[in-house]
C-alpha cells in the first residue's frame, strides 16, 4: 500500500478531523479543574522545592503532561462535547494513565473490544465517532475505519507522525527501517505499519547482535527466531540489511537511541566505506523533545542528595519506565507507582519493578528528615502528583506525632 497517498486522502476526507471542533476554551477550563494542581504550581514557583515538617520534596524541572498528551486529551474532551449523543469509540487507551482512561469511560467513550488478541471493529457503526489515541493507529486500522465511513478524530502526537514520515522516507529509498522500540507497544505497531521492510530492536544489546550479523553473517534461522515478532513479513536478514535507516519509538531512552544510530552508522561505514555510506545508511532526528527534556531533568535530579525517588506514571507507560531506569541506574531507592493508593502506609508501598513485576516493599519511608525526589511520566496529570506528595507529607506528619 502507498501509505503516504492513503494518509493524504484520509486527511482530506470530510469524516476526518485532527484540529478540534472549536471548543478549546471551554475544554481548557474543564481540564484545568480536573488535572492541574495549585500545589504543584507552588512547588514550581519555589524553585521546584517544598519543605514541610521532616520532608523536603525535590521535583524534576520537566515532568508530567507533555504538549502531545495535553492535545490528545483536550481533543477527546472536545469530541464528546461536539458529539453529545453519538457513540464514541477509541482504538486504544488515549494515553497511558489509569485515571485519564477511567475518565474517558465515565464520559461514555468506549474502548474497542479485544477478542483473542485482536480488536473487534464490528462494534463500530458508520454513524459512530472513533478517536485515534496519542500513540496513533496502524494504517490497517485507519483504512478499515475509513471504509466504514465513520467519523475519525485523530489525536496522534505530531512527534509520532514525524517518525512515520521518516520510515516512509526509508521505504522510498529501499532502506529497511531499524526501529528502536518495543514491538508490542501501540506506537511501534503503528510506526511499523507505515514502514516497508522493518526490524524492531529493544535495546543496544539487540542492536549489537544485528550489527554483528551485518558485518560477519551468522545463523539465519537463529536470527529469524530471535526477531520473529519484531520484523516485517518475509524478512530476510541476508537480503534486507544491506540498506538501513534508523527510527525510534518516541518514548525510548534518548541516549540509547543515539548509541544505536551511531552503531549502525559505524557498521555500514565499516562494511561499505565512506564513499558508499549514504547509499546504505539513513538517519533523521526523531527523538521527541518532551521525552528528552524529562530524561535530562531526571538525570539532573538524581545527582542531588536524595533519600529516595518516586516515579509516577502508568505501569504500561514506556517513558515513565525509562525515568525509573535512570533512577535505578543511579542506585537510588526508587518506586514506580501509578496512583496514590499504591502507598499503603508509612511502612508499605506497592510498586512496579523494571521487569514488570508488581512488588510490595516494607519500611520504604526512612525515619527522620528526608529528601524525596519526585517526577512523573508524560501522561501523568499534576493532580496525581499532588495526591502522592500530600500522602507522603501526611504519613511523615503522623509519624512525627508518635
Swiss-Prot record:
What is catalyzed by this enzyme?
isopentenyl diphosphate + 2 oxidized [2Fe-2S]-[ferredoxin] + H2O = (2E)-4-hydroxy-3-methylbut-2-enyl diphosphate + 2 reduced [2Fe-2S]-[ferredoxin] + 2 H(+); dimethylallyl diphosphate + 2 oxidized [2Fe-2S]-[ferredoxin] + H2O = (2E)-4-hydroxy-3-methylbut-2-enyl diphosphate + 2 reduced [2Fe-2S]-[ferredoxin] + 2 H(+)
Identify the InterPro entries for this entry.
LytB/IspH
Instruction: Give residues annotated as binding dimethylallyl diphosphate.
Output: 96, 185, 317-319, 379
Query: Where is isopentenyl diphosphate bound in this sequence?
Result: 96, 185, 317-319, 379
Q: What is this protein called?
A: 4-hydroxy-3-methylbut-2-enyl diphosphate reductase
Sites where the protein binds (2E)-4-hydroxy-3-methylbut-2-enyl diphosphate: 96, 185, 250, 317-319, 379
Q: Does the keyword Iron apply?
A: yes
Residues bound to [4Fe-4S] cluster are 66, 157, 288
Q: How is the cofactor bound?
A: Binds 1 [4Fe-4S] cluster per subunit.
Could you say which protein family the record assigns here?
A: Belongs to the IspH family.
- Which co-factor is required? [4Fe-4S] cluster
The UniProt record lists the keyword Aminoacyl-tRNA synthetase: no
In terms of Pfam families, this protein maps to: LYTB (PF02401)
Q: Which Gene3D superfamilies match?
A: 3.40.50.11270, 4-hydroxy-3-methylbut-2-enyl diphosphate reductase, catalytic domain
Amino acid at each position: 500500500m502507498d501509505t503516504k497517498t492513503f494518509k493524504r486522502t484520509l486527511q482530506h476526507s470530510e469524516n476526518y478531523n485532527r484540529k478540534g471542533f472549536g471548543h478549546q476554551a471551554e475544554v481548557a477550563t474543564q481540564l484545568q479543574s480536573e488535572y492541574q494542581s495549585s500545589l504543584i504550581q507552588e512547588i514550581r514557583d519555589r524553585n521546584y522545592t517544598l519543605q514541610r515538617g521532616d520532608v523536603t520534596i525535590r521535583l524534576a524541572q520537566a515532568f508530567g503532561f507533555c504538549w502531545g498528551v495535553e492535545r490528545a486529551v483536550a481533543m477527546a474532551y472536545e469530541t464528546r462535547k461536539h458529539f453529545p449523543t453519538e457513540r464514541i469509540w477509541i482504538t486504544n487507551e488515549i494515553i497511558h494513565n489509569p485515571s485519564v482512561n477511567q475518565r474517558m469511560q465515565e464520559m461514555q467513550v468506549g474502548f474497542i473490544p479485544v477478542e483473542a488478541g485482536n480488536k473487534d471493529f464490528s462494534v463500530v457503526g458508520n454513524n459512530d465517532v472513533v478517536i485515534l489515541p496519542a500513540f496513533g493507529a496502524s494504517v490497517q486500522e485507519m483504512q478499515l475505519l475509513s471504509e466504514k465511513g465513520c467519523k475519525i478524530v485523530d489525536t496522534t502526537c505530531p512527534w509520532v507522525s514525524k517518525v512515520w514520515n521518516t520510515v516512509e522516507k526509508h521505504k522510498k529509498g529501499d532502506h529497511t527501517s531499524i526501529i528502536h522500540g518495543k514491538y508490542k507497544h501501540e506506537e511501534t505497531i503503528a510506526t511499523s505499519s507505515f514502514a516497508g521492510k522493518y526490524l524492531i530492536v529493544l535495546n543496544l544489546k539487540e542492536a549489537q547482535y544485528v550489527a554483528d550479523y551485518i558485518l560477519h553473517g551468522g545463523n539465519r534461522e537463529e536470527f529469524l527466531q530471535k526477531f520473529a515478532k519484531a520484523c516485517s513479513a518475509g524478512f530476510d536478514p541476508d537480503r534486507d540489511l544491506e540498506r538501513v535507516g534508523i527510527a525510534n519509538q518516541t518514548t525510548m531512552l534518548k541516549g540509547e537511541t543515539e548509541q544505536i544510530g551511531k552503531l549502525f552508522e559505524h557498521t555500514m561505514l565499516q562494511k561499505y566505506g565512506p564513499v558508499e555510506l549514504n547509499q546504505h545508511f539513513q538517519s533523521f532526528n526523531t527523538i521527541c523533545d518532551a521525552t528528552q527534556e524529562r530524561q535530562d531533568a531526571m538525570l539532573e535530579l538524581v545527582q542531588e542528595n536524595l533519600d529516595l525517588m518516586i516515579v509516577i506514571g502508568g505501569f504500561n507507560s514506556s517513558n515513565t519506565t525509562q525515568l525509573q531506569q535512570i533512577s535505578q541506574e543511579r542506585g537510588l531507592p526508587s518506586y514506580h507507582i501509578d496512583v496514590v493508593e499504591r502507598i499503603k502506609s508509612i511502612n508499605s508501598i506497592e510498586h512496579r519493578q523494571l521487569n514488570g513485576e508488581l512488588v510490595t516493599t516494607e519500611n520504604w519511608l526512612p525515619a527522620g528528615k528526608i529528601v524525596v525526589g519526585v517526577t512523573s511520566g508524560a501522561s501523568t496529570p499534576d493532580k496525581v502528583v499532588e495526591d502522592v506528595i500530600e500522602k507522603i507529607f501526611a504519613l511523615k506528619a503522623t509519624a512525627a506525632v508518635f
